[in-house]
Curated annotation (Swiss-Prot):
Residues 701-763 are annotated as: Disordered. Its main location: membrane. Residues 701-711 have a biased composition (Polar residues). InterPro entries: BCAS3-like, BCAS3_dom, BCAS3_WD40, WD40/YVTN_repeat-like_dom_sf, WD40_repeat_dom_sf, WD40_rpt. WD repeats lie at residues 345-385, 402-441. It is a peripheral membrane protein. This is Autophagy-related protein 18f. GO terms for biological process: autophagy; protein transport; response to starvation. Residues 712-725, 741-754 have a biased composition (Basic and acidic residues). The PI(3,5)P2 regulatory complex regulates both the synthesis and turnover of phosphatidylinositol 3,5-bisphosphate (PtdIns(3,5)P2). Required for autophagy. GO terms for cellular component: phagophore assembly site membrane; vacuolar membrane. Induction: By sucrose and nitrogen starvation. Expressed in roots, flowers and leaves.
Length: 763
């Protein structure tokens, strides 16, 4: 017992030490220890998630985009451009049967790239780079800026201020364009190469890459949502950007921002939409509080790097634009620099502009990313002084969702009937429009399908989101870039893996590259009558946008390619292949082979045995490894599957009567029989010569007494001269196996064992 300073023991007023008081203090001490341990565990989890985010940033794909590689004869091939911290890659994805890398350079960080088209007057005399084409514009990292921070370990972060022109023919750099300001995007056509900076656009001649003219724009808004796709679009003849309204233009000004669904009284759908918007806003506000708390902690252990498409580089022009110029879009002619039209597309600053292949449809998006507007550009041809008509038309309002997101990618189909919009949340939204639509009022459209690239949820997702927010990314965003493009397959090709060609194969496919480094091919087809639960699965409530997916178009995954997983990026280039896809050998290291994603029907998933019962063709083993590796635990702790109370149970699927009677009907999981997979340990013994030793008889006797659960699905593997080994890991001798009673099909009968023997087993 502890004593006071004078040597006396602490006592209660009546002279007796209170035993309950000591118990209370002990309980309080234990409670504080538990709270402290839990807090330290949370802190270690946050630090681990933050550190893993920094370490994986070096190997991940920082930027990705699909583009067209133009050949000398004018034909084009579809390529995938990947930017890494160590360099860049160019993949040929025109033929999905022969996806391979054609360029792999590792000479410095690449932020984003753009294939340069051949100029209109391409020739030996007019084209300065005639012998070096095709060309690739690479924005490099050879200039750096100091990021101001209170942290003592703040680092210099590279920013792209130079455009390096890379020749795919000679595999070398042939030209360099240097700028003083930060570069945000590069767009080109057969006439010019436009480089977007903080407050201006420099236009270069496509043949000589010499400075042609400059356009003053609105300042790039570099908030927490970043820049995204970029407020610059270059079509075959026109260039679109965000700038101040030009007073000399007689173009009409588009001022309507809120479009009513109908002129009559508000409907139930509109009321539900408004209520969902308020609910989503409240949930977002509650979530921001938790993110801010974790972000404050994670910011102490994370640097502040630039992440392409998510975090703005440097500081743009500090000049604040007037309210009238915010959200203003100006379309000019590339040749004569005249204004075609100008209109106010959004109330917020513009973050994304994109033309379709014809150059007549223009897609706009703001920094919030809630709605995407589609306009038709209609230039006036008449030179008379009569009253001019409107030079543009607002056709559609594509509703992405209520939450803020960065628009990273916009893609049109050949006929411009389909539009895919990729956001920083890892979701590709597919919209269907009618380009020939007539009318004055824009039509609100919801996504007919959404393709999610996957993100973490729960506590791990919260910690990862806070770590990403501390690194400068948007809360809830996925590191990297989501990009997509349309491809068109022939019905006679081998791209159909999951059904008959007449019913399932579609000419229109979609290639989607996810931040994880995988490219997936999806088949687009209309829903057929009578497909049952597959049609119902396409209709549901989207938790991200709060909108209901209509499910008019089925999006089925066909194949998947892993571009960077389990391979060295420095050893993937094939020296025998050319830039146009020829010469690639079958066993070339530069080629990646797809993983077939096949959707089995009910009839294919079940096979009828000789006795009339049904069972799954291939015995699938489900493991918890993929779920467990996402959790952060101490090395001294046991994994989840190794704990004493954890059990593996196998589903005994023997439902022949239901399958034969109902086909694809639902079944209750409570009615499915299960069988526990028992685990037990034994001492390691040598295999060779062990059964002939004197101790072998004792082990054999112990094996006879040990329980076994051999059934029809348990396979028996024969050991050469030493007995058999079952799936449960118990080794039996040949004499023991022959002495066991065997039924008509040659399968050993299951033996009964007592409860005492069960208690001796080790979990």
């Amino acid at each position: 017992m502890k004593k006071n300073g004078d040597g006396s023991s602490p006592k209660s007023p009546d002279g007796v030490v209170s035993r309950s008081a000591r118990s209370s203090f002990r309980a309080l001490s234990n409670c504080l220890k538990v709270i402290s341990s839990g807090a330290s565990t949370v802190a270690r989890s946050a630090v681990s998630a933050a550190s893993s985010a920094v370490e994986s940033h070096h190997d991940q794909v920082l930027w990705a985009g699909f583009d067209n590689l133009q050949k000398e004869d004018g034909d084009t091939r579809r390529v995938l451009l990947l930017a890494f911290k160590s360099g860049f890659q160019v993949w040929d994805v025109e033929d999905t049967e022969n996806v391979h890398v054609i360029v792999s350079a590792h000479d410095g960080q690449a932020f984003f790239m753009q294939m340069l088209l051949n100029p209109i007057n391409s020739g030996v005399l007019d084209d300065r780079f005639y012998k070096s084409r095709p060309l690739l514009a690479v924005c490099g990292d050879y200039s750096s800026k100091k990021i101001s921070s209170d942290n003592p370990g703040s680092e210099t972060v590279a920013t792209p201020t130079n455009v390096y022109v890379y020749s795919l023919k000679s595999q070398s750099y042939v030209h360099t364009l240097k700028f003083r300001a930060t570069i945000y995007s590069v767009r080109c056509c057969s006439r010019i190469v436009a480089v977007l900076q903080a407050a201006q656009i420099d236009c270069f001649d496509a043949a000589t890459l010499e400075m042609d003219y400059r356009i003053v724009t609105n300042s790039i808004v570099c908030g927490s949502l970043g820049v995204g796709y970029g407020p610059l679009a270059v079509g075959p003849r026109w260039i679109a950007y965000s700038g101040s309204r030009i007073a000399t233009s007689s173009s009409a000004i588009f001022t309507s921002e809120i479009v009513s669904l109908s002129t009559s009284s508000p409907s139930v759908a509109q009321f539900a939409r408004d209520s969902s918007k308020q609910l989503a806003s409240g949930i977002a506000n509650l979530g921001d509080k938790g993110y801010r708390s974790l972000t404050k902690y994670c910011s102490e252990v994370l640097p502040n790097p630039y992440i392409p498409g998510l975090k703005g580089i440097g500081v743009g022009n500090e000049k604040v634009a007037d309210a009238e110029s915010i959200g203003m879009v100006i379309v000019k002619d590339i040749t004569n620099k005249s204004v075609i039209t100008q209109f106010k597309a959004h109330k917020s600053p513009i973050s994304a502009l994109c033309f379709d292949q014809s150059g007549l449809l223009l897609v706009t998006a703001s920094i919030q990313g809630h709605n995407i507007n589609v306009f038709r550009i209609m230039p006036t041809i008449s030179t008379s002084r009569a009253v001019k008509t409107t030079t543009f038309a607002h056709l559609f309002r594509l509703q992405r969702g209520f939450t803020n997101a960065v628009i990273q990618d916009i893609c049109f189909s050949k006929d411009s009937n389909l539009i895919v919009v990729g956001s920083s949340r890892g979701t590709s939204h597919l919209f269907e429009i009618n380009p020939e639509k007539e009318g004055d009022a824009p039509v609100p459209m919801s996504a007919i399908s959404r393709i999610r690239s996957g993100n973490s949820s729960g506590w791990i997702g919260t910690v990862s989101g806070a770590a990403s927010a501390a690194a400068g990314m948007v809360a809830g965003s996925v590191p990297g870039t989501v990009t997509s493009t349309f491809c068109y397959c022939d019905e006679k090709s081998n791209n159909n893996y999951y059904g008959s060609v007449a019913d399932m194969c579609s000419k229109t496919n979609l290639l989607v590259f996810a931040p994880s480094g995988c490219m997936t091919q999806y088949a687009l087809r209309e829903h057929q009558v009578g497909v049952g639960h597959e049609t119902a699965a396409m209709t549901g409530f989207d938790s991200e946008s709060g909108l209901e997916t209509e499910g008019k178009l089925a999006v089925d995954p066909i194949r998947r390619w892993s571009m960077i997983q389990n391979q060295s990026r420095r050893e993937t280039h094939d020296p025998h292949s050319d830039i146009y896809g020829g010469g690639t050998s079958v066993d070339s290291k530069s080629k990646v082979f797809p993983e077939v994603v096949r959707k089995q029907s009910v009839e294919e998933a079940w096979k009828v045995s000789k006795k009339g019962t049904t069972r799954v063709v291939d015995k699938r083993h489900l493991y918890i490894y993929e779920a467990e590796q996402q959790q952060t635990h101490l090395p001294t702790q046991l994994p989840l599957w190794a704990r004493r109370k954890f059990r593996f149970q196998e589903l005994v699927l023997n439902r022949g009567e239901e399958i034969s009677g109902g086909g694809g009907r639902e079944m209750e999981i409570e009615g499915i029989q299960t069988r526990t997979i028992e685990a037990r340990t034994r001492d390691l013994v040598p295999v060779w010569g062990y059964l002939q030793s004197p101790r072998s008889q004792q082990v054999i006797n112990e094996s006879i007494q040990s329980p076994s659960t051999t059934t029809q699905d348990d396979k028996v593997a024969t050991l050469e001269g030493h007995g058999t080994e079952t799936d449960l890991g118990a080794v039996h001798s040949e004499e023991q196996t022959q002495s066991e009673p065997v039924d008509k099909e040659g399968i050993a009968e299951e033996k009964n064992h007592s409860e005492d023997e069960d208690e001796e087993q080790v979990d």
